[in-house]
Amino acid sequence: MKTKNLMTLLLAAIVALQFNNGLIAQEMNKMWGEQSAGNTEVKRGRFFDWGNYAMFIHWGLYSQLANKWDGATYYGNSEWIMNKNMAGIPLDEYKAVAKSFNPDKFDAKQFAQLAKDAGMKYIIITSKHHDGFAMYHSQCNKFNIVDATPFKRDPMKELSEACKELGLGFGFYYSHNQDWTYPGGTSGPKVDHEGNPKTFDDYFVEKCLPQVEEITKNYGEIELIWFDTPGRMPKQYAKQLVEVVHRNQPRALVSGRVGFGLGDYRTFGDMEVPLENVEGLWEGVDVTNDSWGFAWYDQNWKTPKQILGYLIATIARGGTYMLNVGPDPSGQIPEMAQISLRTAGEWIARYPQVIYSAESSPWKHALPWGDVVVNDGKIYLAVFDWSSYGKLYLPGLKSEITSVKLLTGNKSQKLNFTREGNLTIINTPCPKPEKLVSVIEVSIKGDIEVDNTLFVDPELGLKISTKFSTPENCNVKYKGWLEKYGEWKHIYQIGDWNDKSSTTWNFEIMTPGRYFVELTATGTGNRVWNVMTDEGFEIQNRQNTSSIYHTQPIGWVNFKTAGKHSLTVRIPEGERANTSLAEIKLTPFE
């Protein structure tokens, strides 16, 4: 769990009483001032640990192109369109795009208000991405939005002021290693315009370091600086940048992507939510659609329920969630992104205790119907799959329960419950009370004690990663890949199969009987899957696989008794070597 102090608990109380009024920001600033006045060690990240939710904005010269160049559309992250892996735009031609970049519909107050309406607590925006173009008025390099474009305004100054007015934190993304247009920057030209050789040290001294000084001195108080892609840059440069940030902004965090373990917190891979709890300060970063910067074709927007799903899952694993939007060439955030964000924000306004100052789940992983967070000693069940039979099964809670309540905004309804062995069975009303995510508050006596054994829900079954299995003569490994350029997918999978390999899941079932088994896998050719229970019930099925993960039916197994059981998967025949097994799913017979 994240470490919470007295200040955080006080903030939680303020949120509960004053969520929809501007006193939150005032109280936070007051308490931070009091804390730092009496403490020589300044606490960093005012909003990061408490707020749990932030807006990321990828906006730059690439937004003008919107993934089109020379009549062709390039699919992937728009901020990479200049790169050789996409359009491979020559440096001078890319820089010339600045002459037509005029996002005249940009309104900083609208950006900040959207973040506030969405329930986000701070904004991080690209001050300079890999293309080297500065989205603020840089004094050390003319390739910036004020000096090189007809826009002639500093949107970062306007946005920092709008955030301050609305009580939001503000900070910058800065690409410290890659600079594709400045001589000496990684992946940039090796010589200047006069043909003189340039090194990374030249780039660092002439542009990178001065610009980090600018963004940490000229825009008021900063929540954090989000560096990116350190690559093979020497550690000494990253160390110097961290020192600059901490000197100029004592309360600001430095992201883990500065490299070399020098950051104040850990940043996971793009679009990645861990499957198990992670200790310490960390964040997950994600997109509202597929591309970070604006792409004309990209309409694959996350729904409000999907946004809440990723947000709550990140908090339940112990992290902070930062969700990206990409303004269009006119400087406006796409309408569908706004709709999803505001709708999710309306839900957050009804259930702030599920988000702000919330801590990780004692179960340490998701449950079949949703996820769990803890706030001020109370357990909050975020139920995504509401029971159609009027029962919610909460496994493994050992603590004495004093009350169970269904929350509906500012109202609550007492729910009856029973305890059966390792299960708490909560009687729930039909239909589901919330369109998006329903919330049940469980109050307990004393400390929270949990047996986090996997549980096969009598109604929903269980879908679980191989990360939670025990392999023998094979290995569970993390796997990440690009679905298309810039769009990451993440799984854990079992590979390195041979004729002696197996993997076993341990879990608990409440209802004896038959369960349908499905496996999610990839590979080439055919293989035979063998599935056996701890009671000796065995099924076997031959299936073909493909280069993409898909779910395959295997058959029915039978568990004769309730309680703790295990299920083991083997490949007795067929193409083993290139097989990747990602998940197993058990569905109860109805």
Give the location of each predicted region:
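Bacterial Sec-dependent N-terminal signal peptides
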Residues: M1-E27
